[in-house]
Amino acid sequence: LGLVGSEMCIRDRVMRHPNPGAGEFLAQHVDASIVNAGDGAHEHPTQALLDAFSIREALGTLKGTKVAIIGDIVHSRVALSNVLLLKKMGAEVMVCGPTTLVPKHMHTLGVRIEHNLQTAIEWCDVANMLRVQHERQDINHFPSIAEYRAQYGLTMDHLDALEKPIVIMHPGPINRGVEITSEVADSKHSVILDQVQNGVAIRMAVLYLLAEKRKLNNGK
């Protein structure tokens, strides 16, 4: 990838890789801009950008907004990128999931940690639901899908019991009927389709800014 890309004068590269830090490693060895499209269970920066944009679009601001990231935190590259960006933009962040799926180091990032779904959604303005990533698990982190659904699956009954409406997000793909029901995903509370649309614009903007920066640097 590095040598061939250099010979073809490719200046911008979008890279998804199963190993954490792969994009940073490549950036140190090629004369090109690397867009990290996800490196293992580490980070997914452009997803965080589109999520932050979608929240601001829905609520008007990020500062002071309470965002709960709920689900499989330990295997999610979306979670860490969201935490880092949202905190930087002034949002309050909570992570919620089974004790086996929430990394113990999360408290060092200045986020709240919760293990009860109802408590999390009563606290937040935005609930970002994450899927269970079976492909990254080498052991069972909970008894069964049915047990996970019962404890952490978001339903309309949960939302109807709230005193105030909240915004529902999901980075996709959705396991409908597991972490979120179809009724919730397709409800007026959901901005999931807006996230998809905003993702195109955000990633176009990233590539545009890289190209403009190169122009300012005399094409390098």
Region locations from a protein language model:
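Rossmann-like adenosine-cofactor binding region
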Residues: 106-183
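Short hydrophobic/aromatic-enriched beta-strand-loop microsegments
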Residues: 33-38, 113, 191-194
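Adenosine-phosphate binding glycine-rich loop
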Residues: 165-166, 171-220
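Short, structured coil segments at secondary-structure junctions
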Residues: 29-31, 89, 107-109, 162-164, ...
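Glycine-rich phosphate/diphosphate-binding loop of Rossmann-like nucleotide-binding domains
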Residues: 57-130
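Anion-binding alpha/beta catalytic cores of soluble intermediary-metabolism enzymes, centered on
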Residues: 11-85, 170
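Short, acidic/turn-prone active-site loops that include or flank metal/cofactor-
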Residues: 38-43, 98-99, 195-199
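Single conserved hydrophobic/aromatic residue that forms the stacking wall/gate
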Residues: 1-5, 10
